[in-house]
């Protein structure tokens, strides 16, 4: 609606500016950038290009267009060029090229405008593939500067990884020949609606061109965006941010295929093959009859440091069954094998989660998916925090007698945060059911329950008690009951703190 109203306004300004001009038909106004995409937010820049065919007094005409816009307090991005200059610049300047691939005519000579738009599109198709490497590098640079939309307490809706700029870049990349499935395109459209809606609401609330959704603005933006709560808003933003980042990561991988890929299938696990640098499911496998296949696939991908082939991932999403109670024999060992791959397991877990596969293994996972932790200590959503804790714990397994229980404890230590009540008490109660379902013995289940129950004990003791007091040491040992649990808890505390944020762990706390 805002773009339509702006079109009418600009058309009226243009008509007034060219009134009485003999060469009025030699000019056209193009909307470019976000305005061209019809994605104006209330305080967005207005990006306009005036194209003319050798109109001598074009500067005077341009001034008659620009000044009313400035007088209205609108921030204007503007340029005046000939058709030749415009097309030439499309071939040498990435910003111009991307701005024009979604340009549209606002007022003036429609044929001239169409000529420019078609010329820019043709230039992009010819050179776009060359631009993609630079475009991708810009995305990586933004990630370093602006972080990830899904996991920041105060995300940058436009420039953060998984934000609007990534969606735009993928749209441009598709025009240059990058392959993106119809389903991925539909998903991006839905994600765009969520992010753009939040951005528009943020502009309305702050009355300025804000891109970072600050903590104090999240409640009002949630109300304007018609979410039930600020938590619901941030969960939705985290969900779409993850989706966009994952689709983008999959798409950009086309630019850099594995150097050592081979078309010859290599069996890496029962029913699992490495082909062309990706993990595939053998064609003759009946996925519905093999519940643990998804973990074998995931572990193979993490171990090799490669992706799961998209068609194989889709097959898993379509046919993988909900796991029974109890789990199939050996299933918990398969889960532990994946978790012990550490950091390499995270992108694989994300791929499984994008196809709703984790909830078929653990239905309790659903409430923690993309659940925000809206305090200054936590850098991640609950689910990503759990994964990162597991990855950190996998680096510490040399310190403990039971690496399997360490990574299981890491995965479940905050599982209660998805449910009402004290998250520790809820988590203890939940794992009393989950452990036996996994096939853990009573003794092992009790150890993991102790880790969940006391996962804050050592950190709290280090900051609130006198560590030189024998009574403190006695209190801790009495609560834990064994050196096995103490050693596991020590490693879990470090892994958990490092996954929480930079302020949650220090050499002093370690001591």
Regions found by a protein language model. Name each.
Residues 8-22, 26-30, 170-183, 377-408, ...:
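Alpha-helical phosphate/pyrophosphate-handling elements in metalloenzyme active cores
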Residues 38-61, 223, 381, 398-511:
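Divalent metal-dependent catalytic cores for phosphoryl transfer on phosphate-bearing substrates
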Residues 6, 352, 389, 452, ...:
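Divalent metal-coordination and catalytic microenvironments
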Residues 302, 394, 411:
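Short, locally clustered residues in the helix-turn-helix/winged-helix DNA-binding domain
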Residues 166, 197-198, 388, 430, ...:
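Generic recognition of well-ordered alpha-helical segments
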Residues 1-31, 38-40, 44-376:
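Non-catalytic interface/linker regions that flank or bridge core catalytic/transmembrane domains
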Residues 299, 350, 391, 450-453, ...:
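Generic alpha-helical structural context detector
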């Amino acid at each position: 609606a805002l773009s339509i109203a702006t079109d009418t306004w600009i058309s009226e300004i243009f008509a007034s500016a060219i009134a009485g001009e003999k060469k009025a038909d030699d000019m056209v106004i193009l909307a470019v950038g976000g305005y061209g995409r019809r994605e104006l937010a209330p305080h967005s820049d207005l990006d306009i290009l005036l194209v003319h065919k050798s109109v001598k007094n074009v500067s005077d005409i341009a001034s008659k267009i620009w000044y009313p816009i400035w007088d209205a307090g609108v921030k204007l991005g503007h340029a005046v060029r000939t058709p030749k200059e415009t097309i030439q610049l499309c071939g040498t300047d990435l910003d111009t090229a991307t701005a024009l691939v979604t340009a549209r005519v606002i007022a003036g000579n429609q044929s001239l405008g169409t000529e420019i738009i078609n010329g820019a599109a043709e230039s992009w198709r010819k050179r776009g593939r060359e631009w993609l490497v630079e475009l991708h590098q810009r995305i990586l640079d933004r990630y370093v500067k602006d972080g990830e939309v899904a996991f920041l307490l105060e995300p940058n809706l436009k420039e953060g990884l998984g934000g609007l700029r990534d969606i735009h870049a993928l749209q441009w990349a598709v025009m240059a020949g990058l392959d993106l499935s119809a389903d991925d395109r539909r998903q991006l459209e839905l994600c765009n609606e969520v992010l753009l809606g939040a951005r528009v609401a943020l502009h309305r609330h702050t009355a300025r061109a804000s891109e970072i959704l600050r903590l104090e603005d999240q409640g009002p933006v949630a109300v304007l965006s018609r979410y039930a709560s600020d938590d619901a808003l941030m969960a939705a933003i985290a969900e779409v941010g993850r989706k966009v980042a994952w689709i983008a990561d999959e798409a950009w991988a086309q630019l850099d295929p594995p150097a050592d890929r081979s078309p010859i299938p290599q069996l890496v696990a029962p029913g699992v093959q490495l082909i062309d640098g990706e993990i595939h499911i053998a064609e003759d496998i009946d996925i519905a009859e093999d519940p643990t296949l998804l973990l074998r696939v995931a572990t193979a991908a993490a171990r090799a440091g490669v992706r799961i082939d998209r068609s194989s991932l889709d097959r898993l999403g379509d046919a993988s069954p909900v796991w029974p109670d109890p789990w199939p024999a050996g299933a918990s060992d398969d889960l532990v094998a994946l978790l012990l791959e550490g950091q390499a397991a995270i992108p694989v877990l994300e791929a499984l989660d994008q196809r709703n596969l984790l909830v078929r293994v653990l239905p309790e996972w659903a409430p923690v998916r993309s659940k925000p932790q809206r305090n200054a200590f936590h850098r991640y959503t609950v689910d990503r925090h759990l994964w990162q804790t597991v990855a950190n714990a996998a680096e510490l397994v040399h310190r403990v007698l039971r690496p399997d229980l360490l990574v299981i404890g890491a995965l479940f230590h905050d599982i209660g945060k998805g449910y009402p009540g004290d998250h520790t008490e809820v988590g203890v109660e939940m794992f009393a059911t989950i452990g036996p379902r996994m096939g853990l013995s009573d003794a092992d289940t009790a150890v993991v329950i102790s880790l969940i129950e006391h996962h804050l004990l050592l950190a709290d003791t280090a900051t609130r008690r006198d560590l030189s007091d024998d009574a403190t040491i006695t209190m801790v040992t009495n609560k834990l009951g064994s050196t096995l649990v103490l050693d596991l808890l020590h490693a879990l505390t470090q892994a958990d703190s490092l996954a929480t944020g930079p302020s949650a762990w220090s050499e002093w706390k370690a001591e």
